A protein has these predicted regions:
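N-terminal helix-turn-helix DNA-binding module of bacterial transcription factors
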Residues: 1-63
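N-terminal helix-turn-helix/winged-helix DNA-binding helices
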Residues: 2-6, 45-77, 81-83, 92, ...
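Short beta-strand segments enriched in small/hydrophobic residues
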Residues: 18-22, 58-72, 180-187
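Short, surface-exposed alpha-helical segments at coil->helix boundaries
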Residues: 34-37, 79-83, 167, 194-199
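Central regulatory/effector-binding core of bacterial HTH transcription factors
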Residues: 87-132
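Flexible loop/hinge segments that line or gate small-molecule binding clefts
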Residues: 125-168, 188-189
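Hydrophobic alpha-helical segments within soluble ligand-binding/sensing domains
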Residues: 156-183, 196
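Secondary-structure junction motif
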Residues: 183-199
């Protein structure tokens, strides 16, 4: 059975203290030379060392986990958003905990509360209702809205440029000779992205 590589092994291999390795793993490298950083990186890569995420989170108070609350996971558009979130989080060393609200505000609230209890590093929220009281109570520092904008609160928000996209689409339709153009949508009221498309 292969012996598990520890932080002490990496420290011995590189010739630095355990504390230096810990600083590196926690991203605190301001006082560390580029040479030392590279030695540590190579040692970790060569040995396949896996840091203990639980122990790290106790030291840094950062679980390196992003909670994602999706209004409706069956929405075809959201699948590309989910993939983008997953790939970006993975790139920066974060794991992702996805939840589905089934377009139900009570389920959404339960999902958010559960993620907060798990002390996630942050929450990405594709909300059922961007103007609800629930959204107004969320911490601005640890929550990002996606695909819905709130009129009631100011939160970091990531949305498509729906208004310009619709204008560009209509221009192409007219250019192609279409005259009778109909707008078919789910209910518009309260959904910022649909409102922008309609305007």
């Amino acid at each position: 059975m292969t012996k598990k590589v520890t932080i002490n092994d990496i420290a011995s291999l590189v010739g630095v203290s355990k504390a230096t390795i810990s600083y590196y793993l926690n991203g605190n490298m301001r006082k560390m030379s580029l040479e030392t950083r590279e030695k540590i990186r190579l040692a970790i890569e060569e040995t396949g060392y896996q840091p203990n995420k639980m122990a790290q989170s106790l030291v840094t108070r950062d679980t390196k986990t992003i909670g994602v609350v999706i209004a409706d996971i069956t929405n075809p558009f959201i699948s590309s958003v989910i993939k983008g979130i997953h790939d970006t989080c993975k790139k920066y060393g974060y794991t992702v905990n996805f939840t589905n609200s089934d377009n139900d505000q009570l389920i959404e609230q339960e999902n958010i509360e559960r993620l907060q209890q798990q002390n996630v590093s942050g929450i990405i929220l594709d909300t059922v209702d961007a103007n609800s009281l629930l959204i107004q109570k969320l911490s601005k520092k640890r929550t990002v809205l996606v695909d819905r904008q709130s009129r009631e609160v100011t939160l970091d928000t990531v949305v498509s440029n729906n208004r310009n996209s619709t204008k560009a689409f209509l221009a192409e339709m007219k250019k192609a000779g279409y005259e009778d153009i109909y707008f078919v949508t789910f209910p518009i009221e309260g959904i910022s992205t649909r409102e922008m498309r309609y305007q």
